[in-house]
Amino acid sequence: MFEPVLLRNVDVPDGHLLSTYEAGGGYRALRKALGEYTPDEIVELVKESNLRGRGGAGFPTGMKWSFVPKAAGKPKYLCCNADEGEPGTFKDRIIMERDPHQLIEGLAVSAYAIGAETAYVYIRGEYVTAIRRMEQAIAEAHENGYLGIGILGSGFNFMVHIHRGAGAYICGEETAMLESLEGKRAQPRLKPPFPAVAGLYASPTVINNVETLACVPHIVMRGSAWFRGIGPDRSPGPKLYCLSGQVRKPGLYELPMGISLRELVEEHAGGPLPGRKVKAVIPGGVSAPVIPEGELEVGMDFDSLTAAGSMLGSAGVVVIDDSTCMVKLATRIIEFFHHESCGKCTPCREGLDWTVKVLRRIEAGEGETGDLEQLEMLCKGIFGNTFCALGDGAAMGLRAALKHFRAEFVAHIEERRCPFH
């Protein structure tokens, strides 16, 4: 039986309070880090753990930290990406609402490792409760010596600030988030330079996801070998999976990285609704290409899903049953990306505009011969030709829908109607 690590406090009464967190051993990792490790040793510990970023890209966290220049001549910043705008994803919200001190401790240890004295937590503006709980937790931590000047009697100074987002999905992209933090229009930057060298205010900056940072104190307390012992060697550790869609028991599940998608859906989430069958599953938020029912044995980790033609992304698992029209679903998803495109890149801005028009035409029973080929051409023109991955996510998802459920698109065009209505 897998014992929760990241979610161990979420169902504890008053789990968001400092007293509850301390009673469960909270902030011991920060004491240990400051008292027993140098910053470089913390970086090496996280490298050895093989912790990979939980925000979507899966980049090795310790390696990202090591890119920060030792003597930059400028202040260093730590930014927590808590924007969480990916449809089907809600894991970070639960941590911030129910166990905010876990994130704050992760921020403090991580900042100590990279030499940052200031952190910004960029929270999705709609997360009103999460923002309130984080602000309360920051105040508690400051009053009790876990934040501020000379933390726990050490020479380490550290402050955390909350920044509320204004509803733009693009701020989930790290450099667009930095632009927003600086008070500018949220649009992705051209890289290089990468944030580790020139990020917030042109200073060295590390950007990590909420779940990634929450893992750090546990690695400090239990060791890198413990972390590597959970899940696959190349993608180890506990993982938060967000289950939603047409499934009996939607919710947030913490399980080892690498669990099969079928086990996750059928055993833990209870399978499809009564009288229905699973048709497909989106494994990592709507940016991730759909996995058809026959391929659900795939492991829920970065490498396995990439090999299967999809991606783990934010682990927002959306279950789709046999009552769903894939043309309608694909249209709604592309409409979302079209609406959220920042407009900076022509292939994304214009390509998604045309893609929406063609999909709506097909959905309405007004599709024409050649429309599917046109959609494929549009996907080819968008993919790999934009500053960020928003356009890529849209193109990959639509390509997968056309590949696995082409017959439904053809039926809409040939029969001039939706077969599901």
UniProtKB/Swiss-Prot annotation:
Molecular function GO labels: 4 iron, 4 sulfur cluster binding; FMN binding; metal ion binding; NAD binding; NADH dehydrogenase (ubiquinone) activity; quinone binding
Keyword NAD attributed: yes
Keyword Zinc-finger: no
EC number per UniProt: 7.1.1.-
Family annotation (Pfam families): Complex1_51K (PF01512), NADH_4Fe-4S (PF10589), SLBB (PF10531)
InterPro entries associated with the record: NADH-UbQ_OxRdtase_51kDa_CS, NADH-UbQ_OxRdtase_suF, Nuo51_FMN-bd, Nuo51_FMN-bd_sf, Nuop51_4Fe4S-bd, Nuop51_4Fe4S-bd_sf, Soluble_ligand-bd
Binding site for [4Fe-4S] cluster: C342, C345, C348, C388
Cofactor note (record): Binds 1 FMN.
Cofactor(s) required for function per UniProt: FMN; [4Fe-4S] cluster
Domain of life of the source: Bacteria
Record keywords, A-Z: 4Fe-4S, Flavoprotein, FMN, Iron, Iron-sulfur, Metal-binding, NAD, Plasmid, Quinone, Translocase, Ubiquinone
Catalytic reaction(s) noted: a quinone + NADH + 5 H(+)(in) = a quinol + NAD(+) + 4 H(+)(out)
List of residues binding NAD(+): G53, R54, G55, G56, A57, G58, F59, P60, T61, G62
Residue positions binding FMN: 165-212
The protein's role, per its UniProt record: NDH-1 shuttles electrons from NADH, via FMN and iron-sulfur (Fe-S) centers, to quinones in the respiratory chain. The immediate electron acceptor for the enzyme in this species is believed to be ubiquinone. Couples the redox reaction to proton translocation (for every two electrons transferred, four hydrogen ions are translocated across the cytoplasmic membrane), and thus conserves the redox energy in a proton gradient.
PANTHER family, alphabetized: NADH-QUINONE OXIDOREDUCTASE SUBUNIT F (PTHR43578:SF3)
Family under the similarity heading: Belongs to the complex I 51 kDa subunit family.
Protein name per its UniProtKB record: NADH-quinone oxidoreductase subunit F 2
Organism in which the protein naturally occurs: Rhizobium meliloti (strain 1021)
